[in-house]
Amino acid sequence: MRRSYVLLAFAIVLIISIISAQVEADASSDAFADAVADAVADPIKGKKIMKNMGKAMKIAGKVAKAMAPIVVPLIVSAAGK
């Protein structure tokens, strides 16, 4: 009984995080389009913008790699039971 509450809470948190990530992805795609437009208009400023975006993508990749060993087994165990 207690385990089902934990899995339900985890599922709710996961759904909320997926929704917020989707909203953030929509906003970041708009920001990316603006950054590309700025890069085309001003190559010097654009190079700096693209460099910063590359750093942000590397950080996001590291976060995803760190979370995967924790999140994936939880999802698999929740789906299997």
Curated annotation (Swiss-Prot):
Keyword Signal: yes
InterPro entries hit by this protein: Pilosulin
Chain residues in the propeptide: 22-43
Tissue/organ expression: Expressed by the venom gland.
Annotated signal peptide: 1-21
Molecular-function GO terms, alphabetical: toxin activity
Residues found modified as Alanine amide: 79
Keyword Secreted among UniProt keywords: yes
Family: Belongs to the formicidae venom precursor-01 superfamily.
Protein's recorded name: U-poneritoxin(01)-Om6a
Lineage, top ranks: Eukaryota, Metazoa, Ecdysozoa, Arthropoda, Hexapoda
